[in-house]
Structures are given as C-alpha cells and as structure tokens.
Amino acid sequence: MVSRCSCLGVQCLLLSLLLLAAWEVGSGQLHYSVYEEARHGTFVGRIAQDLGLELAELVPRLFRVASKRHGDLLEVNLQNGILFVNSRIDREELCGRSVECSIHLEVIVDRPLQVFHVDVEVKDINDNPPRFSVTEQKLSIPESRLLDSRFPLEGASDADVGENALLTYKLSPNEYFVLDIINKKDKDKFPVLVLRKLLDREENPQLKLLLTATDGGKPEFTGSVSLLILVLDANDNAPIFDRPVYEVKMYENQVNQTLVIRLNASDSDEGINKEMMYSFSSLVPPTIRRKFWINERTGEIKVNDAIDFEDSNTYQIHVDVTDKGNPPMVGHCTVLVELLDENDNSPEVIVTSLSLPVKEDAQVGTVIALISVSDHDSGANGQVTCSLTPHVPFKLVSTYKNYYSLVLDSALDRERVSAYELVVTARDGGSPPLWATASVSVEVADVNDNAPAFAQPEYTVFVKENNPPGYHIFTVSAWDADAQENALVSYSLVERRLGERSLSSYVSVHAQSGKVYALQPLDHEELELLQFQVSARDGGVPPLGSNLTLQVFVLDENDNAPALLASPAGSAGGAVSELVLRSVGAGHVVAKVRAVDADSGYNAWLSYELQSAAVGARIPFRVGLYTGEISTTRALDEADSPRQRLLVLVKDHGEPSLTATATVLVSLVEGSQAPKASSRASVGVAPEVALVDVNVYLIIAICAVSSLLVLTLLLYTALRCSAAPTEGACGPVKPTLVCSSTVGSWSYSQQRRQRVCSGEGLPKADLMAFSPSLPPCPMVDVDGEDQSIGGDHSRKPRQPNPDWRYSASLRAGMHSSVHLEEAGILRAGPGGPDQQWPTVSSATPEPEAGEVSPPVGAGVNSNSWTFKYGPGNPKQSGPGELPDKFIIPGSPAIISIRQEPANSQIDKSDFITFGKKEETKKKKKKKKGNKTQEKKEKGNSTTDNSDQ
C-alpha cells in the first residue's frame, strides 16, 4: 500500500514538470522600461515583433493586453504592434519609496491560446522636491552647553528614489553653529548642529537659522526649514547692587516700620536664576538685627525698634543678596545709617463735642466740632498749627491757644454731596516738623428743598370713547431728589369743574402709583378733549409739589347711526311722497334724502344707495352716492308703474357701519293731472335759471382770487429763495399724526402753521393750516397700555378758533359738504409740503356706480378741518358732481348755487370754501349785487334764498 502511494506521487511530480516545460515553451517574457510622467503615446516597445507575431494575425488571434491593477496605463496599437503609454504614470503613486518599480502585463492571443508575460520597468525622474515635515523647528539649548555639543535635526524626505533622493544639507551662515551630516545604513543622511561658539542668553536670547536640503536630480530641487534656537538661561551672573556702599541719614525716634532705605540689586539672568533674596550678613551683630529688619523680597530696610541718637549715632549694616540659581550666587553691599537729633514728640489731636448730622440748610458759621491739639516738646518744636482737608465747605477757626472750632464755611447740598470725610492735620514747628491727623466724618441730613419733578410738563393721551369704567388711561411719574419721607411722592387731581360736573367724576389718580383711570365711559360727541392737571406732592414738612398737564383726546367710535332729517314732504324718518311728470327726461332730480350722523370723521361720512327692487321690476331712478339726490336714469314711459316705492339705505363709513332706511313714494302723473306741481315747477324754474349766471360769475370770481393768491405765493417764494440760505431753512418738518380713524385719513394736526419750502430758500410760514388748537405735546396712543412719549413739549395749548365752529343746525345742512381733509391734502414732498385746494369738477355725466372719492357726510364738526400728511391721492368730487353750496366760515349763511337745467344728467354735490370774515362779507355783497342785476335783466321777481 505504501509503495503504491509512492509511485503515484512520483507520477504526479513528473506530470507537473512536463506541464511547466510545455508552458515555458508556449509562453515568453519581455522586459521594457519607461520613465514616469511620460506623455500619452510615448513609445515603449515593439511588443508584437518581440513576441514573434505577425501584424496581420494580431486581430484574428484576438491579441490583447491584461493587467490586474494597471491595465489602463499601457496599451498596444494593433495596427503596428507598438506598446505605448496610454495614461499618466506616477512612480511614487505606484511603488512608493521602493527602489524597483515595474508594471506586469499579460499578453494573450488565441488560436492557439498563448500567454506572454511582459514587465515594464518604471524609471524615476526628479519630479519631487525635498520636503520637511514642519516649516519651523524649535530647539531649546541652555547657554551653559559646552563647545562641540551636537544637536540632531529632523531631516527632509524626497519621494523620489536613487540619485534623485540623495539629499545634501546646507546651513545659513552664522557664528555659533556648523552643520554635520550623519550617514545612516540605508544611505539616508540626517543633519546635526554642532556648537562652535559659546551661547550667551543675555546677549542673544534666540537665533534664527535656515536649513536647506538639495536633492541629486537634474535639475535639482531644494526645500528649506526655519530653525528657531531658544537660548535657555543658566545661572552665570551674580546679583549686583547699584553701589557697594549706601549712606543714609535719618532722625532719631523714628516709628516702627519707618523705611530706612530700599536696596536695589539686579541680575542679568532670567527665570528662577533672576529671583533674589535680601538678608543681613552674618557679620551684623544682634543689636542691629533688633533695631532694623530687612524685607527679603523688596530689599527694604525698616526700623524695627526705637533708635535713639543718644544710644548710638551710627549703624553699619552688611547686606547680602542671593539668587535662586543652582548653585546660588551672592552679591554684597554695606549700609551706613547716620542718626540726626530731632524733635522726637509728635503733636496730639483730640476732637470733641461733635454736632452730627448737620442739616443741609444749616447757616454758615454753624459750629460742627471742637478740636484741641498738644505737643510735649518745647520751644518751636512745641508750637502746633492745624489745617483741614482742602476743597470742603468747612474751616477751622482758632478760638484759643491750641483750641480750634470746626465751623460751616459755605452752604451744603445733600443732593450733591451727602457726607464728608474731613482730615484735621496738626503740625509742630520742629525741623523737620512732626504732625498728627484726626478724621472727622460729617453726615449731611436732608431737608425738603426739592419739589417732585415730572419728565415733561404736559402729555397728550388718546382714548377711544365708550371705554369701560376704571379704564387705565395713563401713568404719571415724578421724581424727587430728596431722601426718605421727603422723597415719597403722592399724586392727586387738581380739581376743577367741567360744565356742571366736577373733574373727579370723569377721572381719578392712584395716589401711590400715579395711574390715571377713567371713572365712566367717555363720549366723543359730548367731550372731545379732557384737559386737567395732576399734582405730585412729597412727604416733607412743609410738602412741595408740582403739576402736570394731561390732555386726553377722546377718539370717536362709530356708535351713532345716521339720522334722517325732516323734509318738506314728510316727517323725519317717515315716507316722503313726490309727484313726477312722466315727461321729465333723464337726470331730473325727483327728491333728496337728507341725513346726519352725530359721529365724526369717517364715522360720519354718509353714503346713499337704492335698495334693489323686486325681480323683473324696472326702476328708472337712482340715488347719488354721497348727495342723496334721487334722479331719473332715463326718460319715463308708459311701462313704468305709476307708483314707485323707493327704499334708500343710508350708511356711514365706520367699522362696522351703521345704517338707516328712508322710504320715498314717487307718483308718476301726466302733465294735466298735476297743475299744482306744474305751477310750483314754473315758479321755481325762473330763480334757478337766474341762479345759473350767478354761479358762473361766482366761480369766475373765486378762480380769479385763487389765481392771484397762487401768483402771490410764487412771487413770495421766489423772493425768499433768492435770499441767503439759512441752516435749517428747508429742513424736513416732522409731522405729528395725533388722531387717526380706522381708515387712516382723518387726523389732527399738531402745528397751526405749516412750512412751505422751495429749493434751498428760507422756510415759509405764510400758508395757514386750519386745524384745531392742539398743543405740541408728546403723542401717546392709549389702547389699554401706556405708550412711549416723545415730541416737543415747549409750547402751550391754544384755544380753537371760534370762527370754525358750527351750530347743530348748520351741521345738519352740511350733510354732503366737502371737508378740507378730503379736498386739500398737504403732502410732504422733496421740495417741501405741497397743498392742494378744493376744486369744482367738470360737469360730466357721472358713471352708473355713482360719484367717486366723495366728500364726508354731515355731522362732522369743525375740529376735523385739517391738512393731511403723507402720500396718497387726494379725494375729489366725482366727475358728475357740481357743488351746490358754499359754506362761508365765520358766517352761518349757506349760499345756494343749485342749478337744474332741463335734460341735465349732472348730479349735485356740495363743497365748502374758506377764508376770512371780511372777504366773506365782500363776497356775499357781490353775490347779492349780481343776483339783483340778473333779476332785473330777466324780469324774475322771486329768488330762492332758502339756503342762505
């Protein structure tokens, strides 16, 4: 069994040898070489020719090159059988620092199958410079190192091999070190610094050298590293005193711890070698050690016991100074102390009879304390003088020999200085003099000499009406510079009567916190401005106080619905009956719904709309959006119902809006069925026709006056602009918006005069803005919380102009008047405010939707007349509205200029003019004259002056 296994093993071995021989016969091995970084297409070898293959059989036999790791680096051209470089070859990437580097390829051909092995050696080129691992090497070398001391350095490395990696080193020139190269067994070299000159840290604490490494390639590359050599200190310098002998002269009887001398030694070393300790030498006797002591750290020699001239007049002290080096080094000096005879008794100061604290209102000359001084010496050494700390409101007055009084020299103010630390110095007449001091603490007691002060004299607060009782309006705060009870501030109202009621029925002030509360709901229609004073009183005796003016503006809310006014045809709020001829054309005014709203601003701006009729009904009427005038939209025909019931909805512009409904009954009649109506119409036509010309003349006159005013303003502006510019002449004027509705268009103006600027000229104050007399106070918007306060507080509130107030009856007639807020907007532009005045729109047919940008409704009082800041288009009358009334300020007259030409589709609207009383009277006289002349020319005997 064993022999059979042995025979089988021999047979296997012989078979393996035969297969290996056959493989070597069928396979071959080639060797090529190529330099790294060779370009693409670089020739490596004629591999087909070297393998004995014909070029024509490369493709049929499927000639191919295979490599396990680097198959894409080399490629064979099947057309010519040349092996060439296909991609970049980096020897350092392939083989690292290995000396031998090759690429192994397997060339395979079929028919029959043959495998050839090809080794391509990659030769190195010098493409890498020497590199150091760091840019700077630090070496710490003690200055005590001996000559020829060696300090190894970290060498450079080169990624190349062979001659390209052989490095040589070079050191920058210096006088302390030379460079030595050590060869390693692996042929690497590393540099070593060799000390050739002793180092001295005191002369050169550090050295900077440059080590350069150069490789052996062609061309050669270099790399460098900076060497920072830090010289460490060695204790090679002994401490040295400034002088070997010190001489000191001092008087006898010096107190303990009196400084005799401060010795100063220096050591050129550093660190612990520079730290020194002072001590008495072993040669100093014990008697001197008892009388003097030395501070081992600072070198100060001080008196430790009584020194008396009569015992010894000189002392010789030997002092050593030792550093903390290893080994320590010592320096020496001698101190000669010479004592001088002197006045050896100091004065004594005694302070008695203190009257503290001192009230700040104490009279000048008040005695604060008594001071006595004494000195046990005699003669000049026993004569004592006293002095006080300078720059204090006290002085010393001598009352008797060695007795003084501390008295008040000037007025005290506790708020400026609450306490004084006085130092009384007593000095005798010795040479040198001795002195003693005593401290006196004087506390200043407070008196009530400061009244509580508010941050500003007045504030403006805005509160919405209908507030709940106990609503927090504002918080006042005053500050008192005094202390304790004198600084406790309490607040109260300055009581006064508002009509028949007292102020305390409206508001209250919390005595401690200063919070102001509204005791009842405020009503804007009843009380627009609540102005009162809050008093702040301190707790002093007698108490001092000051007042603060608080202006509370009650902001309007939409809490009043529109109210219908009575008309000649019916009672207020009831149905109105009107007769209309079927022959009237489009645009004929049938009736006018009049309403008034007790609110202000947008809450009183009324609009009218016709309620929709039943489905399929034809209503030939419409209502003016802001005039309330019901007019025909077309010519009436037989198909129209003889009785029309119109529902007109009147609503304001508040949030939410409130409404009222008016009912108008219109009866359509034939001409023969309404003789009374016809007669009334014939009677009214004449004055209306006569009034047309009056309106034309009046409009022409107004335009002429306005043009003259504009020309005057332009001329005045040009003259002012031609003058020398003054700083701040045309600066931006900060507008203060102090009242705003929810839609943001109604505002109160803080300033009664507005500046008109042009270019760089002087400011203009000629243009008057009619506004309520609001004080230029800080604007505070109260919505349940206190708000920030700012603005100019230097002006006082002014009373509003009575010329711009209207009676209740006049307000009712202004249901469709154009307010100055809507017609004139003062806009702050780049060149200054730009004012637009109300104008009459052209008489063009109005659109179906009604008037656009309407005037405000009735019920708005004169306090709403103001200019408006900010951009935005001014609200103007609609294109189909012609003003039918002029309201002349200062006069209760309402001049009617209504005209109703036949077949006219023009709706009417009102606007208000403004001006002085004298100009108003002249215009009224002129209107009356024109009307009289028109009456005479046309023969009309009646004039409708109902609106006047």
From Swiss-Prot:
It comes from the Eukaryota. Residues 732-892 are annotated as: 6 X 4 AA repeats of P-X-X-P. Residues 783-804, 827-948 are annotated as: Disordered. One of its GO terms (molecular function) is calcium ion binding. PXXP repeats lie at residues 732-735, 772-775, 797-800, 830-833, 871-874, 889-892. InterPro entries: Cadherin-like_dom, Cadherin-like_sf, Cadherin_CBD, Cadherin_CS, Cadherin_N, Protocadherin/Cadherin-CA. Coiled coil: none annotated. Residues 717-948 are cytoplasmic. It is a single-pass type I membrane protein. The chain crosses the membrane at residues 696-716. Residues 29-695 are extracellular. This is Protocadherin alpha-10. The lineage of its organism: Eukaryota, Metazoa, Chordata, Craniata, Vertebrata.
